[in-house]
């Protein structure tokens, strides 16, 4: 097998090795009692936020093929869209500092394009592989492929998913792990636990219920790692297989287990807990945090938490324990909140005892952990802002009802906005095409561009709110109650303040090592004040990860350091590939028989 030196000489790994700022001996080895160590003098205190600070790495390659197959994760058959014929998609894993080269093949026969987003991966100075049709690329046409290549300068647990409209809600996602140090010790790694809500109908069909102004469709079951249960009778419904199973894992007394809870849902923010066990939170969204203990956790769509669970349960009532997850706002919206089983006795196949649902779990609410709980291990101080942040600059979340739209001439469609306009991107002319053109091109208002033409290292602040006076907004909207998991591409952000109720000017920002992450839950009728450093040129999406809301336009795009974008793409030698892919998509799209008045039936993202 080639050595690391061979990889570097061959030019396959873009190597930049900087001082690790390690606090531990250089010979410290990662193990059950030394998880803060990593390798080559790198450890939990090494400043991963600097993309130049990463260990030496190797090349790791994967192939992902997109197809439609019949799946029945909860015992009910339906057509799913999946990677490599499996649901969820295969685990993609690498080590901190590695370069991943992932080739995506679109073998769909239903006419859909596709593109893959590497959720939470910073993609420093490689915006063109962020995988957002209409923003960073044209879709991959059926029968064609695309190579995504990036270096893992962060570590932790995340996921990858289609960013082509609602495609991932039909099953097109999988877990992603970048191995690195941990802020607390553990013995056994149980890997990612993907938690999702599940439907028996196609997501593109269901979306029209929401577009018509009705409440978003309610899922029928909850899945943990692609397994769940749905109450049906095979004798009455041929789609019912009668084969239902919970996700199960085995614990050994006294062992400490690490796992990562990853919310890959379409609609629901989940409250998660394990009967009879506390757990220690050690990471949130690729940001290692000082360990803290709890027994219940809210996980918004797109959020990830690495936790450590010690196998020390009181087994007087039995040796098996339920894993639970329910919707944070209405616990009974899916009647069964049991999503998995932990067994101390592998031979025991009985159902665990079911303790009464505590008020703590039922009324836990929809808030993220408190700012005082999520303390980053690698400390950062937020600098002064360079942008305006008055009330007229707030990012006001709301639903716009019964208005004409670029993609639907019948003015009965309900949309969501994160600014003044619901987003609508054109798959044939993505933002990066405009930014790399030989002449200046205007961004249509429905692409919702927000230009960040500031120097590297300067900070921008933004206030997200779903609780404000309607007199303060340009376009009418309804303050429909909902949790909004807001995700930023290309960065994580600092959370300066967060809460319920309206934001008031007397609220002071937390600037000294505030929590950092890439998805923040704006609670029902609440706000979140975020900030990030301008240092990664590109067109980066900010959007609600509630899929129906994103589909209905709840997004904007930051055009960051626009003058640096084209030189980066040219220097990387990918400008021709980018143009060829768009030309290929246009040829395919123009050859498809699509009615003139229905070219694209949602925001595109």
Curated annotation (Swiss-Prot):
- Binding of Cu cation 4: at which residues? 484, 544, 549
Q: What positions does the entry give for Cu cation 1 binding?
A: 117, 487
Record-annotated residues binding Cu cation 3? 163, 489, 543
Q: Which domain of life is it from?
A: Eukaryota
Pathway as given in its UniProt record? Secondary metabolite biosynthesis
Give residue ranges for domain Plastocyanin-like. Answer: 65-183, 189-347, 424-567
Q: What is known about what this protein does? A: Dihydrogeodin oxidase; part of the gene cluster that mediates the biosynthesis of geodin, an intermediate in the biosynthesis of other natural products. The pathway begins with the synthesis of atrochrysone thioester by the polyketide synthase (PKS) gedC. The atrochrysone carboxyl ACP thioesterase gedB then breaks the thioester bond and releases the atrochrysone carboxylic acid from gedC. The atrochrysone carboxylic acid is then converted to atrochrysone which is further transformed into emodinanthrone.
Family listed: Belongs to the multicopper oxidase family.
This protein is called what? Dihydrogeodin oxidase
Q: What organism does this protein naturally occur in? A: Aspergillus terreus (strain NIH 2624 / FGSC A1156)
Gene expressing this chain: gedJ
